[in-house]
């Protein structure tokens, strides 16, 4: 298993590299959003474009833009 912490990589650098890329954002509630990452701030507030909301693996809604409060975010995957 690779030890990621040995790289000493700042997560904000990773987040700035993936602006404009398709991402998956999972919330603490289990809801998943997929869309194009537009911005992330210091509080992990996230703005997505062309976003889709999934619950239990099923598409619930499609949004043009979605704004997600950072304290609800479990993880961001690119």
Curated annotation (Swiss-Prot):
GO annotation (BP), single: tRNA processing
Entries under CDD domains matching the protein: LSm6
Main localization, broad class: cytoplasm
GO molecular function ontology, one term from the record: RNA binding
Transmembrane segments: none
PROSITE patterns, per database record: SM (PS52002)
Highest taxon, organism lineage: Eukaryota
Subcellular location: Cytoplasm; Nucleus
Cellular component aspect of the GO annotation: Lsm1-7-Pat1 complex; nucleolus; P-body; sno(s)RNA-containing ribonucleoprotein complex; spliceosomal complex; U4/U6 x U5 tri-snRNP complex; U6 snRNP
A family per Pfam: LSM
Every Sm domain range: 10-78
UniProt keywords, alphabetically: Cytoplasm, mRNA processing, mRNA splicing, Nucleus, Ribonucleoprotein, RNA-binding, rRNA processing, Spliceosome, tRNA processing
Assembly: Component of the heptameric LSM1-LSM7 complex, which consists of lsm1, lsm2, lsm3, lsm4, lsm5, lsm6 and lsm7. Component of the heptameric LSM2-LSM8 complex, which consists of lsm2, lsm3, lsm4, lsm5, lsm6, lsm7 and lsm8. The LSm subunits form a seven-membered ring structure with a doughnut shape.
Similarity comment: Belongs to the snRNP Sm proteins family. SmF/LSm6 subfamily.
Entry function: Component of LSm protein complexes, which are involved in RNA processing and may function in a chaperone-like manner, facilitating the efficient association of RNA processing factors with their substrates. Component of the cytoplasmic LSM1-LSM7 complex, which is thought to be involved in mRNA degradation by activating the decapping step in the 5'-to-3' mRNA decay pathway. Component of the nuclear LSM2-LSM8 complex, which is involved in splicing of nuclear mRNAs.
UniProt protein name: U6 snRNA-associated Sm-like protein LSm6
Phylogenetic lineage: Eukaryota, Fungi, Dikarya, Ascomycota, Pezizomycotina
């Amino acid at each position: 298993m690779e030890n990621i912490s040995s790289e000493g990589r700042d997560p904000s650098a990773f987040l700035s590299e993936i602006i404009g890329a398709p991402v998956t954002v999972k919330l603490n509630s289990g809801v998943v959003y997929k869309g194009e990452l537009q911005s992330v701030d210091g509080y992990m507030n996230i703005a997505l474009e062309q976003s889709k909301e999934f619950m239990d693996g099923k598409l619930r809604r499609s949004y043009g833009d979605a704004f997600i409060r950072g304290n609800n975010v479990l993880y961001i995957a690119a």
